């Protein structure tokens, strides 16, 4: 990755019999610039194949990482669910309501790493990337300190939110066991985004797979053999996340792939932190408003009559929806890197091509997943519980799950485009209005003022997602990608200048 090498974003030399697929990103950019509106459908198809190969080379491993990270909590809840319906409700409310809030903050803050590091990588400003990652870690650890109090006092908080005493008690036990996990989040999220921005995704996938397999074995031992209950399961979850931090950190420190982007720890990470902090806040608000929206559905469901059944049913549906979300977040991370790399490299037309191809791809995938959910809904319900009443309640909600899965094929991808382009602040306002001013109130009215119950809450929230998705589509269609290249160049230039000034000053 020396400065003398010709830069080509991502994997740009793919072997194919088709001439177009042998071209680099700058060559494709020049082709699109010259041909413009005269590009024929035959050539658009070849361009789509070219982009799809790049996208899947990157997103395949990104999806594995995203899904396996989520599966750590998924497997934990599956094992605790067989301890009893009350334990399942407690673990679910702690995982969704408490851990989900913390993870939303950490993941949202880390999306700023994707924006700045991705654009810096595209512009070949490699030395600034390690400093950006360290700044992110500092801010994440500071946030983790404040979140610790949320975990420790989760019982009273859950009761204040209307959860029953029994569910709040079980949830507090589980949440306190996850306190070490918060600090693991604070380090793992920036490190993974730092590696993804450099297109280092296969090693991340291997590390995540190894940790997941060990986690599954340890969780089974703790819950089924040693009978350590909820607390034991939560502590194993925390341990697994720290193991993930350890292997990710060792890779960054020891791998030759990071020798130009990670030049060691530096006090420069503490300087010039304010501009990055502002982007971090916008990123956190944007993604948190999305993640908490679904978590709110679970929490509000606990306020209905017969809360244990309602909470178990919606929690199981949310776990499947979140599994699908992790799949789409893997694609979202890939498109974020694609867009940020291409904007940083000055290829606006290739960035736009990436956006179109990934959206067509995800809509097709979501359509297939909808059919699978509807056909196998009873079997999928039994994976979590043997309670006949809960199974029936879950099966009744699966049509709504199918609708949400289809929307997942569009909304997270457009959010990934926003992250790659640095639009976090704008999307944060969109999320606030469509989700919390419109969708959530409609859901509460339908859930509590009609006989629809939890289905009514979900329908209202689906309305919010539809409005948000339509807004993002309009925003994307109206984007001037040439201007976005200029914005990316200015963002990278500012970061690089700050780092160079501090280096010259001996900081």
From Swiss-Prot:
Acts as a flavonoid/H(+)-antiporter that control the vacuolar sequestration of flavonoids in the seed coat endothelium. Could transport the anthocyanin cyanidin-3-O-glucoside and epicatechin 3'-O-glucoside in vitro. This is Protein DETOXIFICATION 41. It is found in: Vacuole membrane. Induction: Positively regulated by the TT2-TT8-TTG1 complex. The chain crosses the membrane at residues 63-83, 93-113, 138-158, 171-191, 203-223, 225-245, 284-304, 313-333, 356-376, 390-410, 426-446, 454-474. Its main location: membrane. It comes from Arabidopsis thaliana (Mouse-ear cress). The lineage of its organism: Eukaryota, Viridiplantae, Streptophyta, Embryophyta, Tracheophyta. It holds the Pfam family MatE. Residues 1-62, 114-137, 192-202, 246-283, 334-355, 411-425, 475-507 are cytoplasmic. Belongs to the multi antimicrobial extrusion (MATE) (TC 2.A.66.1) family. Disulfide bonds: none annotated. GO terms for cellular component: plant-type vacuole membrane. InterPro entries: MATE_euk, MATE_fam. Pathway: Secondary metabolite biosynthesis; flavonoid biosynthesis. Expressed in reproductive tissues, from buds to siliques. Restricted to the endothelium layer of the ovule and the seed coat. Residues 84-92, 159-170, 224, 305-312, 377-389, 447-453 are vacuolar.
